[in-house]
Design a protein with these regions (language model features):
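Intrinsically disordered, low-complexity regions enriched in Ser/Pro/Gly/Gln/His and often acidic
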Residues: 1, 14, 34-36, 231
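Bacterial N-terminal signal peptides that target proteins for export
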Residues: 1-9
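Bacterial N-terminal signal peptides
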Residues: 9-18
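Juxtamembrane cytosolic interface motif at the C-terminal end of transmembrane helices
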Residues: 20-22
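Structural detector for internal amphipathic alpha-helices that build alpha-solenoid repeat scaffolds
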Residues: 24-37, 53-68, 78, 86-103, ...
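Amphipathic alpha-helical scaffolding segments comprising HEAT/armadillo-like alpha-solenoid repeats
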Residues: 33-45, 67-80, 102-116, 138-151, ...
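Short coil turns that connect the paired helices of HEAT/ARM alpha-solenoid repeats
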Residues: 47-53, 80-86, 117-123, 152-158, ...
């Protein structure tokens, strides 16, 4: 059973706000959103009303019924094919939060995949891909073809970007290697005119790993090598992660480059380097001394992320114990940094820390 990750009451309020209508009262128009109190079954019946606004309001109300909404799923899925774009938006949003029984997962996944690939409205495509990510890869791997097509959608770079992000989740397979279609889509997206799409593409290639298809693998290595030697440091960082993922024996060389990026003055380059180190994990142990140096940085955001990165390395970063202890002892230390440093110390001991604090 899937229940979604969004805050259901908050989403319901958002949906209700989008479905307001005017009512006459004492000669004045009352613009306050009003949704009648009805049973869930009554709202399900309204999903078939000939008036699109009635269907829209029903989709706004149903998420308010919490975990007892599984009986509404078939009717909500049908609204994904609604001729009204606004209703399709609400249907897709509802499927991102409603309780879905195991028996309804295949049909729900297929409905969302169809919207992701075919819907004429970019907003519906985007929301459908976002909703798909609530499902486990075993349930949604069947959507890869649809996501590959969405990664080529010409009318919205955001749709292309989120499609590539979803392909990482559903295209990764540690047993058989990454899905060849997912890797090929990311390779093609490296030529996208939009920087966010190209960034999603390079990170997807880096995270997916080495393809078993020799031809695709050769294309990946060629593209990563070119980017690793290019002038864009952020893309070079992720190209290095990708190359390390292609050949573990070359990791030390690539980690050395990433460690050097921690010393750059550009904040974004530093942050990307730290994120890359967290992805590489234990093999990035040689970066620990440079991460320790960042604990003295004047930028709270850098210090905070240095703590998080050290914590992600667990026992491999144990030489950071004293510097982290010293940092925690500082007077008037910003609370999120103190909590992040405390969590990092716990991780160095192999202990699962408390939930991470919000960023400064």
């Amino acid at each position: 059973m899937r229940t979604g990750n969004w805050h259901i009451p908050l989403l319901a309020l958002m949906l209700i706000g989008a479905a307001s209508w005017a009512q006459e009262s004492g000669g004045k128009k009352d613009l306050t959103p009003k949704i009648p109190i009805k049973s869930l079954k009554s709202w399900i019946i309204d999903l078939k009303d000939k008036d699109a606004s009635v269907r829209d309001i029903a989709l706004s109300a149903i998420p308010n019924y919490g975990s007892s909404t599984s009986e509404a799923i078939p009717a909500v899925i049908d609204r994904c094919l609604d001729p009204d774009a606004g209703v399709r938006v609400k249907a897709v949003m509802a499927l991102s939060v409603l309780e879905i029984l195991d028996r309804d997962i295949p049909r729900t996944v297929d409905a969302l995949a169809k919207r992701a690939q075919e819907d004429p409205q970019a907003q519906v495509r985007y929301l459908a891909i976002n909703a798909l990510q609530r499902f486990d890869p075993v349930d949604a791997r069947r959507t890869i073809t649809a996501l590959v097509e969405a990664s080529k959608y010409p009318n919205s770079y955001e749709v292309r970007r989120i499609a590539l992000i979803a392909l990482v989740k559903f295209g990764m397979d540690k047993t058989t290697g990454p899905d060849t279609k997912a890797v090929a889509a990311a390779l093609a997206a490296l030529k996208d005119p939009a920087i966010p799409v190209r960034y999603a593409a390079i990170t997807a290639i880096a995270l997916l790993g080495k393809p078993n298809n020799p031809l695709v693998s050769a294309g990946v290595e060629k593209a990563l090598t070119e980017l690793a030697n290019g002038s864009d440091k952020i893309f070079a960082i992720w190209a290095k992660v990708g190359l390390a993922n292609q050949d573990v024996l070359s990791t030390a060389t690539h980690v050395k480059f990433i460690s050097q990026m921690l010393k750059q003055s550009d904040l974004q380059v530093k942050l990307e380097a730290m994120r890359a180190i967290s992805v590489i994990g234990a093999l990035a142990k040689p970066t620990v001394p440079d991460l320790i140096d960042l604990l003295e940085d004047k930028d709270n955001f850098v210090v905070f992320n240095a703590c998080l990165t050290l914590g992600s390395l667990n026992v491999e970063a144990r030489e950071a114990k004293d510097p982290l202890t010293k940092l925690i002892a500082k007077k008037d230390l910003y609370q999120p940094i103190k909590q992040a440093a405390t969590n990092a110390l716990e991780s160095l001991k192999g202990v699962t820390p408390k939930p991470m604090p919000k960023t400064p």
